[in-house]
Amino acid sequence: MFEEAFGDIQEIINASMELNGGATGGGSVAGAVGGGGAAHHILSQSTSLPVMPSHIPLHLQNQNMNQNLPEPSARSGPHLRIVEEPTSNIIRFRYKCEGRTAGSIPGMNSSSETGKTFPTIEVCNYDGPVIIVVSCVTSDEPFRQHPHWLVSKEEADACKSGIYQKKLPPEERRLVLQKVGIQCAKKLEMRDSLVERERRNIDPFNAKFDHKDQIDKINRYELRLCYQAFITVGNSKVPLDPIVSSPIYGKSSELTITRLCSCAATANGGDEIIMLCEKIAKDDIEVRFYETDKDGRETWFANAEFQPTDVFKQMAIAFKTPRYRNTEITQSVNVELKLVRPSDGATSAPLPFEYYPNPELLTKHNRRVAQKTVESLKRSLMSTNLHPSKQVKTSSQYTIFSKPQIATTTPQTQVSPGMPLMFPGGSPNFVQDIKMENGFMDVDSQSSQCPSVERNFASPRSNCSTVDSIPPMQMGQNQTHLYLPDATNFTFNGNFASPSSNCSTVDSIPPFQIGQRNNHMYLPENSNFPVNGCSPTHFSGGSMTPINNNNNVLINNNNNDFLSQKMSAISIPPQGNFGIKQVYQQTQQFLPQLQPESIPYLAQSHPEQSQYQQQQQPQEQQPPADEPTQSFSDLISSSIGMAPIDTSELIQDIEAELNSLGIQPFK
């Protein structure tokens, strides 16, 4: 029926154009569903449909003249007039996927007191049947077809392809859109909706469909209703001028940011943040970071990185912060972020956000600043008298000594002039200059090197390779360990190892307390002479300075005793191995034959040692009150350390002793 009506309207338009000679520039009405017609039949938007009085029945003219209209029409010919505009309030555009009706479009005068009203139009100056076509167009001129659809549950047959069409009988002059609502097309469905309108040639204002390829520029939440009418003139249908309603605003759910898990991030970006919000579409939402100047102009912006799958139930977004325009900032920068809906450009209220410097770059920056500060301070001090290079003292009450240099050359052998024949092997090596002093024989060491007082030396015939395991000399105790052969009896100062010992230590031999000093010494097996524990100067022949590691006196007698006892060792003990026997130390002291001169250097270098030696010497030279009876072997042993022995007198004494025993000596 609608197609037949459209054919009648086209015939009416063509006939009127022939009568008027094409003055009106007629054409076909674009917008009738399924209508044919040549493409050159186009009506201008400002041209009303020609209504020929000869074509209008007389009773219709009288009816129009006598009918009382609510508002008199300013136009004399048939036309459409809007009685009730759609509401200016925001309404909800329903999606098809919601599974419910889109509701209805309230009118401008709708209220709780007066009741609900709906958009209403009226056909003026025409009493015949009228076909009304309603579609959605954009809110801005030129009025192009809008992709949203008009739908109705009760009048499903009247709503096809997103448009609403209805035929008004002659007794009805008004059309009320009471059960018609607006269905929101998805972003992916918008182009298909416009292609369907283009196919059916629904374009009241002949604005073309070029916008079907620019979906992003279409405001999804604002549109208008376009009313178009077709009247019957005789056997023809004539279209009336289309009109549009006031804009209808859809409820584009207000974008609101409820909460952010963090309001700061590094300048490098990439920090993950979760935002809580209200009712967002995962395919139509952006999180925008931006910065403004003092005048409020936007100087920088960047969108956060997230996918539609990062939107959780239209209530939360997990996104990554974008990189700030300057990643080498040294101070925090305050920016703002907001939600943006690309389809309609709606935005949320902005929230403050902070970009802070990267920790690695901040550390490097602080170091550079500190280095520059120090250099600047140095340059400032150079121009003053506080710089160290300018603080030179011309005089001082303290004497400046140079740091002693450590000798790096090979030590050279230096021998005292008084000791050229006392070293059959080599001479001791030392670096420092030595004092002039008398030489003496050193029987403590087996080599020509200077032995240390911190080591003890094994017997010449002992199998010991070292005696490092022997406990060091202890100067704080009054005990001495003495080990003597059975057939020997001589005066000594020190401890001696067993002649038949094959061990590396003498700790296993039972000690015996015999004296006031504590030294470990080892007597050669075939020697019978008094010896001293160790040379206080570490080597024989002279020294630079005696060594005192324990800060105690390391010698038992004075220097004269050392020299005299060593130079008087001329006796040879009998051959053979003897058993070990513990005896009492002989207290008789014999004066040496040779008394060397005192060494002033030692006295000056170590006055405490000399003083201690002077205190010890009188005590050692005092003879004891009780002297034990000497045997024949003791008599022979007691001759050690005396002047050269008169052999003839000794032989006479031996013969006299043998005669007294009744033994005839052999001659």
UniProtKB/Swiss-Prot annotation:
Q: Where in the cell is it found?
A: Cytoplasm; Nucleus
GO MF, one annotated term: DNA-binding transcription factor activity
**Superkingdom field:** Eukaryota
Do you know which SMART domains this protein is assigned to?
IPT
Instruction: Give me the ranges of the annotated region Disordered.
Output: 445-464, 604-638
Ordered alphabetically, the record's keywords are: Activator, Cytoplasm, DNA-binding, Nucleus, Phosphoprotein, Transcription, Transcription regulation
Coordinates of motif Nuclear localization signal in the sequence? 364-368
One Gene Ontology cellular component term attached to this UniProt record is: cytoplasm
Consequence of mutating G181D?
In Dif1; immune response defective. Reduced survival following infection with fungi, and reduced levels of Drs following immune challenge with fungi or bacteria. No down-regulation of the serpin Spn27A in response to bacterial infection
Q: Name one GO biological process term.
A: Toll signaling pathway
Please indicate if the UniProt record lists Repeat as a keyword: no
> What residues does the RHD domain cover?
78-372
From start to end residue, where is composition biased (Polar residues)? Answer: 628-638
Please list the residue ranges that the record marks as compositionally biased, kind Low complexity.
Answer: 604-624
Q: Which InterPro entries match?
A: Dif (IPR011363), Ig-like_fold (IPR013783), Ig_E-set (IPR014756), IPT_dom (IPR002909), NFkB/Dor (IPR000451), p53-like_TF_DNA-bd_sf (IPR008967), RHD_CS (IPR030492), RHD_dimer (IPR032397)
Q: Which residues carry this modification: Phosphoserine?
A: S343
**The keyword Flavoprotein belongs to this UniProt entry's keyword annotation:** no
- What role does this protein play? Mediates an immune response in larvae. DIF binds to the kappa-B consensus sequence 5'-GGRNNYYCC-3', located in the enhancer region of the immunity gene CECA1. Involved in the melanization immune response to bacterial challenge, possibly by acting in a Toll signaling pathway that down-regulates Spn27A in response to infection. Part of a signaling pathway involving NF-kappa-B (rel) and Toll-related receptors, that functions in the apoptosis of unfit cells during cell competition. May be part of a NF-kappa-B and Tollo signaling cascade that regulates development of the peripheral nervous system.
The protein in question is named Dorsal-related immunity factor Dif
Natural source organism: Drosophila melanogaster (Fruit fly)
Phylogenetic lineage? Eukaryota, Metazoa, Ecdysozoa, Arthropoda, Hexapoda
